[in-house]
């Protein structure tokens, strides 16, 4: 579990250090087990949720398209998509099935039957592009992140074609990241304590009421999500992110080839999260800024620029270079392998930014009064689509076709373009309205989401779910109180976490704010609260113990 090149921290060495590190690793694994058990308690393993089923339908369809016909590049066979819908994965289930929406999403037998129908239905491979370059039987993800298709395909290959495999794969990936973390930081007791805090934060989010089929607390009563939802799957980047943070916050140590291999593998998990959930790009921006500031501070303290490029130093430039190289390579690989139907149909293989930005203006209380008519009264996600449609219809007939599909629907690329134009038009003509939305209405909505998260923690769950975090924090306090070097590492790590909390909030602030999209922000807030509590309690214990020892020494001398 430990890299031979990683040096131990000061006095925290030998058997005591190894025992604490192994104990921390075991606690992190137990917390992951508690997470999975909680999902079983909430009946979220074999089922789908109202908030996430449409995204998962795209992912399942893409995975089955690749499994059956070997067609990748995030292409979806429309016939398989339709088969899944007819078999029950829809908001309008067949009355003969004897189940209504959303109860069909909780019927594990019906969902499995739908998967088997799509897997076994007798179909020839989809036809290639016609003379006009059109793919009649294939579609894309319609403006959603395409990495969910790769995730679902990997789950089906690993666990078979079933819904529970989508949950199990999450834990396989997070466990792999935890093992890699242990290999890279196993000799640092403080670093291992920090990863316990991250896993504890993930556990806390699973215990929130919005991670449920339907919230039941006083703070959240709407449809929720589960770990299969891309908005939660983005958290597979949490441990890889902590891995590279701690490389710069723990005391400097020597690196070897194994350390760089581990960093590259963590970066690969990070890149996978970015494909599944594009707003995770916040972590890339935060890391880049963190490295630049940390590097500047290192140079200011007297180290030469040449020493900063010493690849054997943990606080060296080659580490971020490796991480960024892996992330960039993954993005390029995904772009190269993208099916040509995306270009042909004007689809976008990621979450659409400008559509979300324009749609977020609806958070303003007076949006409907001021701008509702300009969108023909359309609301929510339909509003940007209607705005784009109106703009396209104002164009001369010969210019419209480039923005429309063969069935007359608006292309996703056109939706992004006209959403951007509409947003800047409102910003230019009514900057006060936009400023009020972003600096008054959105922060208020963010605060409401924070209350929904913390207010709904452990709602409807047995008491043991709340006792687990208390036991984990108590363990961390004892660990930190017993080891001054570990306490120092935790203090340095906690000091930079607020920066990551703020940056994690930026994608939500720019687009929409609700508990489901703010999960990354919640994770790092909980990490900071846990580390702050542990540091304060451990410091107090060490202070009292030191005072008692000094008193005893003084008494013996007297």
Locate predicted features:
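Transmembrane-helix motifs of polytopic, lipid-linked glycan transferases
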Residues: 168-198, 240, 474-478
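Perimembrane helix-loop-helix junctions
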Residues: 2, 14, 283-328
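Membrane-interface alpha helices of multi-pass inner-membrane proteins
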Residues: 262-277, 322-326
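Membrane-interface anchor segments at the N-terminal boundary of transmembrane helices
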Residues: 159-173, 223-228, 434-504
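Membrane-proximal stem/loop segments at transmembrane-domain junctions that anchor or position
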Residues: 62-133, 341-445
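Transmembrane-helix signature of polytopic, membrane-embedded enzymes
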Residues: 182-217, 257
